[in-house]
Amino acid sequence: MQLVDRALSALEVLSRNMDGLSVTELAEQLDIPASSTHRILTSLKGNHLVVQDAQTKKYRLGYKICGIAAGVVKGSVLTQAAQTSMQKLAEKIDRNVVLCIMEHGVAMNIACSERGDSNMYMMKIGHVIPFYSTSAGRVFMAYMDRKQALEILEKETRTKTTPNTKTGLQELNAELDRIRAQGYSVIDEELQLGIQGVACPIFDINGEPAAALAFTSLKDGNEEEMQKRIRLLKAYAEEISEAIR
């Protein structure tokens, strides 16, 4: 049982250190020998619960943990309240619709209603999404304290995945202002060429973002249709907000 307890403690510590920890750093926080820590991490890595950065050699939580967490969240009030609205929205706009949350500094998908191309990037439940280059990630940052948002951006490896990806702090800061002003975020071929993503916030009883409702779409150049989809997205996000208040 001691090994299990230590493994769970290791996962808990890593969940608070999203940039990862070395064997020595984790051993210090767990107050156990580095050799024991290494054995625990080797076991967790073998089960895909942690991953090791090839360059820094630091360990962080693996995506499998996020999938497990998503399974727990499925039964939550939020997901249950959103399910019907998500299905209706997906049918009306004929696009994939996803529900995202932010927990412990990580943004992830927790529910999805699929229409059209189900193989589209970042649609899988439990998938951790970047803040800087996704519509939902930017929505979360736009509605949090700006200092906190900038700290998140500074920690992220902001890679240009397409020529259109915004990576500069100044341009991303301006984008967050725009999102607050219009109430939604649009990613136009920034994550994948030919793909657009749109998200807007779902608010809890305190007026704080509880989640983000988003859809992805192949870019078709029809701006009028896109605006119709955005209006529907905002309407259904408000419907879900009302349901959880």
Predicted regions and their residues:
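Extended hydrophobic
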Residues: 164-239
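Acidic, low-complexity proline/glycine/alanine-rich linker and hinge segments
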Residues: 158-164
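Short, acidic, Ser/Thr-enriched surface-loop or helix-capping motifs
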Residues: 54, 102, 203-205
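Amphipathic alpha-helical effector-binding/dimerization core
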Residues: 56, 60-155
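N-terminal helix-turn-helix
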Residues: 1-74, 79-80, 238, 242-243
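Short, structured helix-loop boundary elements
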Residues: 1-4, 23, 58, 62, ...
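Cysteine/selenocysteine-centered motifs that mediate thiol-based redox chemistry or coordinate metal-sulfur cofactors
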Residues: 151-153, 157, 237-245
